[in-house]
Structures are given as C-alpha cells and as structure tokens.
Amino acid sequence: MGRSAELRRALVVEDEIMVAMYVEDLLTDLGYEVAGMATALDEALCLARDGEFDFAVLDINLAGQLSFPIADELRRRGIPFLFASGYGSKVRSDAHAEAVRIQKPFIGRELARAIARIA
C-alpha cells in the first residue's frame, strides 16, 4: 500500500522509546518521513502547535497523562491524526470519539490502513 500524496511527514507521539522507534521504522518502510517525535505531553504540545508535518500518530497514555490536548491542537490546525493504544477502548474522549484508533501492538499493514482512513 503506497503513501497518500497529501500525507508525507509524520509526528510520532509515544512515551516508550522502543515503541516510538518501531513506529518510526514502520512509517519509513511505508514511505513516510518522521518530521518530529515526542515522548512527553509538554514536548508534544509544542510540536503540535508549531511543528511542520502532515499527520500524527498519538499514543493515548503518555506516562499517565492523556494525549487528548495534543489531539485538540491538531484538530484546531486541521492536521489529521490517529490514536495508537494498548488500552483498547477503555480510555476515551467524547471530543475524539470518532477518531481513528489502532490497537497496539500493530504491524505495518495495519498502520497503513489506519493512515489511509485519516487521509
């Protein structure tokens, strides 16, 4: 599955560095560029406000803090995003109930399908 013409550069927000590196590798293998990576809420919010990227992959739980404020900022900027979570539907936000979610662990094919849904 090829990358979308509109979505080329990704922001990855993930607090577990090994998982972040795995997601970065998957995105690279799928033909995307990782334009930014954040492991903490404050860092991710700065990137969400000022970063230059086309879409984002957000872990929901960042060391006990929820990533919904990041999603709010991305929505405000009109940047598509998807949530990646190992918690299934246990952690929810009414404001983002319709957001695309991918269940961890996932493989490249599943990530590609999720990205296609936000394109």
Predicted segments with their positions:
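Acidic catalytic/metal-coordinating carboxylates
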Residues: 66-69
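Two-component/phosphorelay signaling modules centered on CheY-like receiver
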Residues: 17-36
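A Lys-centered signature of the CheY-like receiver
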Residues: 104
